């Protein structure tokens, strides 16, 4: 079967890998000049199944109101005359109940755990290198109240058999020795030893190279204009290269997926949530993190990537605006200065922003659509890197007519019907 994938981010390329492994003829089209040049380019770098949680949670509406008055807020709302923005926020608020949070987190952990296992298998199969480390994730708490709020998350981790450790301050420093120089009080942390780190952009580039060696074609610099349809079937993709035809199509365009899908009557509830990152050259190994530390206070991830530190975070609802804002850089810098002072050359750091494709319930949209040969693999939010291999394998099995290894019906877009 000939399969055309729209999008060459980490999710699209992972999907291409698994489809090609099943013997399909695979073509990937993307407007950029190489793989992983959008959201996958400089994300926070963690592969964190245990930390997979929906943003929609009990208490979040009140937290957002408080955050909006803070100078180093992890959340920024730039209101627009945009029905999609307000509809998405309304749907997200509807998921801020205890029952919805438990349901959505369970979905996310299920897929993320599966994805981590698929990533390990892929690494064994290919020998791919991407500055990866298997040293776990440490969710760091500055207050006792933050620690007390982990009970529900721990219950979900237990239900899925996810390993975890509750640490006091000394335990946090034992796991991350650089924290001994922290400039702020530390109460404790939740360590997830099964989590990993790695450079998502490097992984995507290397996996694309492996795909090319296996016969996958990449059409870079290709603008996607829309779909041609006949009844319940996609007949072609209209593009800057003309009509691109295949037997099956996969939309893996991240935040841009809903703009294309609405042309054929599919309302994908995905909204771009801008995130920022800094990549800092390490100047003192002893002061630097060894893996990923999640600063719970500011919702910022500080990750070791080879001889660099990647600091990523903030959530800015500003539509498709990717402009860099220096006040967000100050937020990132503040966290790394407080937790890992003198670890890197901050003036030499690169500053980046990208759009995370967020769904209201935090769970990606994977599976079929009303068009029998169009499939979705999109809406992974902040967890595209964490969920990429599992999502790719899952959809490849579905397209190939194989029974997937995990439950998947609740990941399809049909959950938003009505």
UniProtKB/Swiss-Prot annotation:
Pathway: Amino-acid degradation; D-alanine degradation; NH(3) and pyruvate from D-alanine: step 1/1. Keywords: FAD, Flavoprotein, Oxidoreductase. InterPro entries: DadA, FAD-dep_OxRdtase, FAD/NAD-bd_sf. Disulfide bonds: none annotated. GO terms for cellular component: cytoplasm; plasma membrane. Its EC number is 1.4.99.-. FAD binds at residues 3-17. It is an enzyme of class 1 (oxidoreductase). GO terms for biological process: D-alanine catabolic process. Its cofactor is FAD. It comes from the Bacteria. GO terms for molecular function: D-amino-acid dehydrogenase activity. It catalyses: a D-alpha-amino acid + A + H2O = a 2-oxocarboxylate + AH2 + NH4(+). Belongs to the DadA oxidoreductase family. Oxidative deamination of D-amino acids. HAMAP family: DadA. This is D-amino acid dehydrogenase. It comes from Granulibacter bethesdensis (strain ATCC BAA-1260 / CGDNIH1).
């Amino acid at each position: 079967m000939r399969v055309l994938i729209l999008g060459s981010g980490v999710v699209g390329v992972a999907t291409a890998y698994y489809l090609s492994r099943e013997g399909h003829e695979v073509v990937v089209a993307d407007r950029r000049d190489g793989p992983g040049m959008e959201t996958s380019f400089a994300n926070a770098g963690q592969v964190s199944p245990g930390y997979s949680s929906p943003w929609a949670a009990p208490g979040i509406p009140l937290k957002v109101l408080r955050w909006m008055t803070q100078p180093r807020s992890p959340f920024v709302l730039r209101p627009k005359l945009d029905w999609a923005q307000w509809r998405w926020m309304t749907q997200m608020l509807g998921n801020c109940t205890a029952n919805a949070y438990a349901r959505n987190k369970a979905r996310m952990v299920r897929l993320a755990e599966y994805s981590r296992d698929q990533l390990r298998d892929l690494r064994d199969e290919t020998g791919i290198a991407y500055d990866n480390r298997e040293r776990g994730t440490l969710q760091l708490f500055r207050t006792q109240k933050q620690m007390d709020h982990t009970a529900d998350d721990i219950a979900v981790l237990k239900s899925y058999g996810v390993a975890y450790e509750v640490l006091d301050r000394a335990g946090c420093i034992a796991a991350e020795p650089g924290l001994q120089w922290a400039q702020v009080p530390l109460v404790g942390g939740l360590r997830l030893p099964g989590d990993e780190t790695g450079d998502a952009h490097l992984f995507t580039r290397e996996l694309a190279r492996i795909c090319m060696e296996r016969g996958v074609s990449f059409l870079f610099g290709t603008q996607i204009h829309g779909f041609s349809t006949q009844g319940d079937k996609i007949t072609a993709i209209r593009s800057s290269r003309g009509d691109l035809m295949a037997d099956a199509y996969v939309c893996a365009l991240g935040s841009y997926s809903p703009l294309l899908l609405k042309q054929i009557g599919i309302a994908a509830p995905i909204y771009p949530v801008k995130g920022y990152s800094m990549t800092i050259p390490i100047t003192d190994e002893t002061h630097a993190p060894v893996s990923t530390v999640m600063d719970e206070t500011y919702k910022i991830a500080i990750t070791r990537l080879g001889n660099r530190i990647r600091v990523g975070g903030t959530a800015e609802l500003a539509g498709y605006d990717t402009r860099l804002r220096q006040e967000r850089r100050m937020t990132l810098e503040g966290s790394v200065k407080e937790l890992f002072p003198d670890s890197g050359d901050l003036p030499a750091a690169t500053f980046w922003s990208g759009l995370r494709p967020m769904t209201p319930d935090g769970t990606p949209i994977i599976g079929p659509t009303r068009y029998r040969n169009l499939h979705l693999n999109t809406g992974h939010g902040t967890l595209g890197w964490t969920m990429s291999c599992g999502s790719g394998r899952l959809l490849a099995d579905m397209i190939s007519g194989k029974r997937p290894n995990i439950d998947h019906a609740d990941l399809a877009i049909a959950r938003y019907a009505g």
